């Protein structure tokens, strides 16, 4: 056990970020609303931070932090990795909520374009061996879905 609960961690981080004391009632309501959006059981907020969560629960917990802390830049690395279809939809809905309401930037690193389907994509970059070899708009995602990554493996 970590003795730090998810709820406590998020509230403390939010207070550090804003420099203001967060009223418990306001925080609790926002946390409950956000957890409901992510289809998370309210009891998760009382669990130890990052202890005993399944893979899908960890991913949802990451998106919960994203939505509660509203960073100006978030890097999501393989957020869809290992998720079933329903969990991908839920995580995508959380990311979509961030795009609509948080006015921040996202860098989403993924091998699967499924998570991108419901999101607004401004730029798409293809990396091979740590180098960006092609940049485009959302249509590049469609191109990759149609033809795969094979052409990039030859580069």
Stretch-by-stretch model annotation:
Residues 70:
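Conserved catalytic motifs of ABC-family nucleotide-binding domains
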Residues 66-67:
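ABC ATPase C-loop
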Residues 94-108, 116-118:
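Conserved catalytic loops of ABC-family nucleotide-binding domains
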Residues 78-79, 86:
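Walker B catalytic motif
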Residues 62-63:
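Hydrophobic anchor residue at the start of the ABC signature
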Residues 1-5:
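Short, small-residue-biased leader/transition segments that mark boundaries at the very start
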Residues 123, 127, 131-154:
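Conserved beta-strand-loop-alpha-helix hinge in the C-terminal portion
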Residues 6-18, 30:
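Q-loop/switch helix immediately C-terminal to the Walker
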């Amino acid at each position: 056990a970590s003795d730090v609960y998810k709820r406590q961690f998020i509230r403390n981080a939010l207070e550090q970020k804003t420099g203001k004391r967060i009223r418990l009632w306001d925080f609790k309501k926002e946390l409950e609303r956000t957890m409901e959006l992510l289809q998370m059981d309210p009891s998760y907020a009382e669990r130890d931070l990052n202890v005993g969560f399944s893979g899908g629960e960890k991913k949802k917990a990451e998106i919960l932090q994203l939505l509660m802390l509203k960073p100006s830049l978030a890097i999501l690395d393989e957020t869809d990795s290992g998720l079933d279809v329903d969990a991908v939809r839920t995580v995508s809905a959380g990311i979509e909520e961030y795009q609509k309401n948080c006015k921040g930037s996202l860098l989403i690193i993924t091998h699967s374009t499924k998570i991108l389907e419901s999101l607004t994509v401004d730029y798409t970059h293809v990396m091979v061996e740590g180098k960006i070899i092609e940049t485009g708009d959302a249509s590049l995602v469609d191109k990759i879905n149609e033809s795969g990554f094979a052409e990039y493996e030859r580069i």
